[in-house]
Amino acid sequence: MEKIEGIEVHNHKDSSRILNIQLDDEIVKKLIFPFNKFDLTALELKPFTRFTIAKSLDDLTNNKLSKLINSILRDRSTGCFIIGPKNISLKTNDKFLVKLATAVAHLIGVPNHDSMAGKYYARFHVKHEDASDSYLRKAYRNMDLHTDGTYVKEVTDWLVMTKLEEQNVQGGETAMLHLDDWEHCDDLSKDPVGQQDFVWGSPKSKNIDYKVEHPVFSFDKEGRPKISYIDQFPEPKNMEQGNFLQKLSDALEESKNKIITK
C-alpha cells in the first residue's frame, strides 16, 4: 500500500478486512482553516461547499486519500475503514467531526437525502430515556445486525457513521459482520424465500410515505451474495416469509465472526 504523508494506515487489530486510517496532528491543523470557512448551516444549504471541503482534505494528501478509501470500499475483501484524528483535542470537536465526515463522504460520492433529518446527514442523541418509534436512539437495547436503505427507493451503497461525543456511558460498541465471514451465508442466500420480494415499511419518524418491495438477497455480477435487511421494517406476507426472517435474524446474531469496534 502506498504511503501517504501525514496519514497512518494499518489493519484493525481484529480483522484484516477493516483498515484504520489516522490523520496526524499536522493534517488536522491544516484542515482547521478550510473547515472554518463554512459553518454547518452553509454546508446544509449550499451543496457545493461539501465538495469544497472534500477537496481541501484530499489536496493535503496529494489526492491519495480519495484513491485509498475508494479502493477499500470497492474491494469486497475489505469494504470498510475507520478514519479520524490520531489525537483528539478541543479543535476536533463535534463541528469538526461533522465536516470531516462530510469531506470523506464527498470523496466517495453524493450522499442520499435523509428524510428523517431533512438534510444530507442525520444527527441525533442516544439518551437515558427515549420514546421514539424505533431502536435507533434507545440506549439500552442492542440494534441487531442490519444494512441501511432497506425501506427507501434510493440505492444505498455505503454508510458513514460518526460518534461525535460520549459522556457518562459504558459500552457503545459497533458490531460488524462481513458476508463472506458469515457461517450461514451460503445456505440462507440460496434459500428461494430469501429471493422473494418482501414488503419494507418504516415508522412515522422516518418521514417516508411509501413502502418498497425487494428481496433480502441478491447477487452481484460475479454471483456473490448481497443482502438488504433490517429486522424492524420487513412486513412478511405469509408464514413462509415470517419464518425465514426469524431464521435469518437468529443466524446473524449467533455468528461467531462479528467484529466489535468502539
Predicted regions, residues:
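A structural signal for short, well-ordered beta-strand segments and their strand-loop junctions
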Residues: 81-85, 114-116, 160-162, 173
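A gly/proline- and charged-residue-enriched helix-loop-helix capping module
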Residues: 102-137
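Short, solvent-exposed beta-alpha or beta-beta edge segments that form flexible loop/patches at the rim
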Residues: 62-68
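Signature of the catalytic double-stranded beta-helix
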Residues: 93-115, 237-255
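N-terminal, charged low-complexity regulatory/assembly segments
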Residues: 47-53, 72-91, 100
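Short catalytic/ligand-binding loop motif for oxyanion handling, primarily in non-cytosolic enzymes
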Residues: 90-93, 169-171
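Active-site environment of non-heme Fe oxygenases that use a 2-His-1-carboxylate facial triad
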Residues: 1-61, 76-77, 124-261
